[in-house]
């Protein structure tokens, strides 16, 4: 029987429920339990695919093409398990499903209500994850904060589910804040007490409290929370601020979170195997070489817009013993200032994905700077398209070359709409999404990095390289190193007369993991370190020359 763990949050938003859920998943998996993690988001959007990155952060794409919350990226990276569209549920998708049933007449003329129809649909979504993959444990994170009106149907559904599947098969975990008041010189339990009171008024008694704090919580305060919140003192867990999110599983293991979870769910206690994770964290905290990477993007005012890119760079830095320093550059600034004003001194340049014409010329300027100055460059999705435009304009002799997305009247549309996108009207969920195979050509940088002929990568785009210009770019020295298996779609391009210059149409950042960094990122960071540390000795199998 699958066990169900529900993670709620109180006191403040952005308290770190996703990291707690992902960390618990890591701890259970280290004990050889299979885990799937589900996110319930209370917003009315069907999915985050059409939401602004400035509001929502990045859109994380699963293997099966679902556009999901960035927390699913944490789930995948921490548990090293691929999630699917079943692992992401929004209020909008719940209401859409119920309303479609009502329109079909499935409710036989009955009045459709939040209880039972909406709550039943929520419960069915949770149970479907267990049915699909039959994991030992399904961890469900409920978005928002207890007390928010938007979250009430989700909380009611998980309250009902305990009776439905059996009390011994459900655990409620509440993540709260324990603030330290400097003027009083003490930590305060009252916010947590009130948050638990709010949760109990809904009918949910938490089994475990995970208390976020910037310092250790004294035993006396844990005892106080135990008495006021009716939780065993050993189930009051400190989640102290860490230097890195990857240290959190180790902190929670030291607090006994997994042990208490297994005890409450009546599961077998097993010894954890966290040696590789501990070694990874140790590597993160003991770098040998400083490496500064510029991220030239359109949404840099919100770092979460490029969360998976940053984490993939971090994974690669760990593998290459690099101390990663990021220089965030708004691509619009490069449209009015010389690139060296912002890019001078960086060891590598990443141009990530995005949509729309704003800031594109700045991205193209950054790419030209990287190519001219022999600075390692990695282009992702839109970054790949911009690299093709830059080459076509400045090397291929196609003055004014552009993407049809940015200029529908351009004389040289080197990037064009995918044929299957021609008649698409709706924006949501209609792009080329999810995993597609890619054939790697031999004797290329891509083949040296991947060490494989066929790879699988995740996509999210409507536009592609225009094959009408394939031969022209090849003749001018550009190399196409990855295509769809039928050779029709160009997926990877590179410039061989350069220390490291490669771009891909897909999003490799979505498949990078702390202990298995993505080869494109590892090769890129290694090349960037070599810029400022030519004698660096890398303990990594990646060879880029």
From Swiss-Prot:
Span of the signal peptide: none
Residues that, per the record, bind Mg(2+): 71, 141
EC number(s) reported in the record: 6.3.4.2
Chain residues that bind UTP: 13, 188-193, 224
Pfam families (alphabetical): CTP_synth_N (PF06418), GATase (PF00117)
Pathway per the UniProt entry: Pyrimidine metabolism; CTP biosynthesis via de novo pathway; CTP from UDP: step 2/2
Entry binding sites for CTP: 13, 148-150, 188-193, 224
Record's function text: Catalyzes the ATP-dependent amination of UTP to CTP with either L-glutamine or ammonia as the source of nitrogen. Regulates intracellular CTP levels through interactions with the four ribonucleotide triphosphates.
Note: CTPSs have evolved a hybrid strategy for distinguishing between UTP and CTP. The overlapping regions of the product feedback inhibitory and substrate sites recognize a common feature in both compounds, the triphosphate moiety. To differentiate isosteric substrate and product pyrimidine rings, an additional pocket far from the expected kinase/ligase catalytic site, specifically recognizes the cytosine and ribose portions of the product inhibitor.
Protein name: CTP synthase
Species of origin: Nostoc sp. (strain PCC 7120 / SAG 25.82 / UTEX 2576)
